[in-house]
Amino acid sequence: MEYMILWFFFVVSLISIFFWIRKQPIKDWIIVFFLKAFLSGFVDSFIVAYKLLEYPIRPFPEVFQIEILFDLMVFPILCVFYNQTSYNSGFKGILLQAILYSLPMSAIEYWGVKNTRLIVYHHWNIGMTSLFLVITFLMVRGIIALIRKYSKP
């Protein structure tokens, strides 16, 4: 069952690329994607190394201790969608959307903890996941805003 879930998220992620890649400015979305992937993978490496949580079933377990599908694909794609929908929003809209985007992913993770062997919490909880997602969404949103501001001629 766990591998079917991973395949489902992989296929949905691949399909969703065709939706976000067509919107302009495409270079911004590519930067957002790779920045979020870097942040998620980097932070998750520490979280796993300090045994706050673990991923017993994951792609390429002999190479990666982190859940690369979510860290390097699902979360970055979700962050691109977040940046696209909050593109013209004010601060309140940006913050509210960051919270709203983090809630479904947190709920999915919580379901995964309770019903699968994809993720096991040791010294971690759903609130920490939600907070991590909101903070990284806002960080990436802020960084891309700075890039836009200082890259204009």
Could you describe each region identified by the protein language model?
Residues M1-P153:
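Aromatic-rich, lipid-facing transmembrane alpha helices and their immediate juxtamembrane interface loops
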